[in-house]
Amino acid sequence: MNEQYSALRSNVSMLGKVLGETIKDALGEHILERVETIRKLSKSSRAGNDANRQELLTTLQNLSNDELLPVARAFSQFLNLANTAEQYHSISPKGEAASNPEVIARTLRKLKNQPELSEDTIKKAVESLSLELVLTAHPTEITRRTLIHKMVEVNACLKQLDNKDIADYEHNQLMRRLRQLIAQSWHTDEIRKLRPSPVDEAKWGFAVVENSLWQGVPNYLRELNEQLEENLGYKLPVEFVPVRFTSWMGGDRDGNPNVTADITRHVLLLSRWKATDLFLKDIQVLVSELSMVEATPELLALVGEEGAAEPYRYLMKNLRSRLMATQAWLEARLKGEELPKPEGLLTQNEELWEPLYACYQSLQACGMGIIANGDLLDTLRRVKCFGVPLVRIDIRQESTRHTEALGELTRYLGIGDYESWSEADKQAFLIRELNSKRPLLPRNWQPSAETREVLDTCQVIAEAPQGSIAAYVISMAKTPSDVLAVHLLLKEAGIGFAMPVAPLFETLDDLNNANDVMTQLLNIDWYRGLIQGKQMVMIGYSDSAKDAGVMAASWAQYQAQDALIKTCEKAGIELTLFHGRGGSIGRGGAPAHAALLSQPPGSLKGGLRVTEQGEMIRFKYGLPEITVSSLSLYTGAILEANLLPPPEPKESWRRIMDELSVISCDLYRGYVRENKDFVPYFRSATPEQELGKLPLGSRPAKRRPTGGVESLRAIPWIFAWTQNRLMLPAWLGAGTALQKVVEDGKQSELEAMCRDWPFFSTRLGMLEMVFAKADLWLAEYYDQRLVDKALWPLGKELRNLQEEDIKVVLAIANDSHLMADLPWIAESIQLRNIYTDPLNVLQAELLHRSRQAEKEGQEPDPRVEQALMVTIAGIAAGMRNTG
């Protein structure tokens, strides 16, 4: 581990030096000296030197407006380079990700050593593996795509420099390339000028597929196959690909008026176009590789006389022609041209699969397995994973939009107002209409624009090739009628298949009622007939934590899942739980392995479906090697959770969690909802108002333009508190509740829960990670610089609470300091703090200057505004998870 730290530190220091030279070349010695002085003061301040801390504050307060941007950019770019170095070190031979594929081997060995598990049972568990990762464009991916590409190249240089055998001239060439890349980054604006459109976000998702997943997925499957052969003597069937990718980019219209039916239609076409583009490159390689002559009679019959000379090439060239024709047609459609469908248009995965698989079988039968298992096998696996749609999309819409559409319709038909009916009346109407053979929508009806949009979206789903849309997610779902309403709207659009419709339960009350809602639905005969034994339910992490605090929310999520698993098991329904986690702790983020093993027993039987959000996509799938590592971690965790499920918690543990939940929720809401000073404090102590100026995502920060904390989306709420380092949403209420239970004499019981119950130990581990990233002196500095003195007591109270919380968490976990069992992460946080601290101090200063100008009725200085945006991006890089 120490070797890993020192290798990381020396790379970070080397990159910092190159950045320093770049700054000196661009802006002169005096700016570099200023940056170096600040860095040294920050390092000394971190080591506990109070005089230097004071000097750091004074130096940053006294920067002239001309110095603000260069200093902010220097520390922000440094953090991007540090993250790149860390990403490289995680996949370098000494790093943690390099050992992650080993996770599969370790898991298989662990499972084989369990006397109650036969090899056959383990094989069956492997065969039922299912992992669906849903990529979402959260506005927290702050780094521009342009800079991400440069950082990928920096990573490649670090990898080559690690090779001890390279010649001096090669070493010098690589160093020159590094200098060029860092100079290019320095001279590139790190802040987007315009908000991305939903189509831009979708293209960002396709870039992740092309640059990383396309190679990463086949590599992961080779790794998995190797471990299975070695440990179980079992070969993965060619058609077995347990991982799929879905996207919300272009499909998630919840609170985002920019995602329309036309946008979704466009993104579906664009996704298919990108798939043809990537498969064409694969097929081109196969045309040149598969020059073999010998083939089975079956393959020769397939190609006929015309193709007998080079049967494999003949099939590949045919497939290439079909792909080219499909691509040309899609291109015309994207330009708005209406062309007749060409002959051989590819719409189904089977059409790609069959010629490729015919070649594979023939090569195997003719003793050319070594060739079959090369590029051809990788392409076959890509067909199974990505296929014609490349990534499927989910549609997500808020429940009230469907209710309003049906209300408008029933009023027009003169049969009453659906919106004001009781739940029983709504259900009776919906079931009657779902069973009816006549259409419900009148031909000459002219609905409002909002309702038209809901109906048009259903039309897009009905017209899309089957398999290109994965599920319809209903956010803020509360009742059975919310689910039935979507089925009725889809039926009216003429959908010819049963589309999975997933209610998303996301507030504390909705999570507590989730099981009742699903029980009622499963008691409806028509509904049981429709779903054919399969149900997806989405669990919301971010909104429940914002509603009730992290402790109450996580217990409600656990209980909702637990009850749903038991209800579906009893009813003979295969349940897929869809987890809407974020990258940050306040939105349910946790290291994958720990998070999965902390769920209720049986929660992964129907596979894992989970959102991968914004900035976390780059950290977990930004390079093919990291993709292999992340998928291996998930695989190991799913196998372990299904074959060695965590124990059912004792009744006394459940009672303690109930108690913790009530106490923490009361305290959290007491501050956030009931304390009259809280909202003014939040608005002034964090850059919440300024965040709205950042052109981050295509979606507005608020569900409604006015209103307090409750109208804010969960992401800006978390993002704002991460910026001022108080990290409040991720801990408020939790420690106080633990302290109360300790005072009631139950510390030994809490310690047992921490030892023996993965759910509870993961909660404590997540709290420790938050506390390690929080910084009370910085939070206090924001107060002093930005907050009205009358509100200072509230800030002090919150900081004191955090100090007490840290003590109680360490006492229960029996640790002397935070992150004792994860030294690698603790080291990484410490390394970045030296560069993040100056950005925090500078941000408080910039907010002060900007708000002061506004108070005096002046336009804020553009240099101040630009530097402020850079500090927001830089702190996000330093914290490694934004919202």
From Swiss-Prot:
Cofactor dependency: Mg(2+)
One GO BP: tricarboxylic acid cycle
Residues of the active site: H138, K546
Annotated GO molecular function terms are: magnesium ion binding; phosphoenolpyruvate carboxylase activity
Q: Tell me which UniProt keywords the record has, alphabetically.
A: Carbon dioxide fixation, Lyase, Magnesium
Give GO cellular component annotations, separated by semicolons.
cytosol
Its top-level enzyme class, in one word, is lyase
Coiled coil (UniProt feature): none
Q: Which E.C. number(s) belong to this protein? A: 4.1.1.31
**PANTHER family the UniProt entry points to:** PHOSPHOENOLPYRUVATE CARBOXYLASE
Question: Can you tell me which family this protein belongs to?
Answer: Belongs to the PEPCase type 1 family.
Q: What does this protein do?
A: Forms oxaloacetate, a four-carbon dicarboxylic acid source for the tricarboxylic acid cycle.
Q: What HAMAP family does the database record attribute to this sequence?
A: PEPcase_type1 (MF_00595)
Q: What is this protein called?
A: Phosphoenolpyruvate carboxylase
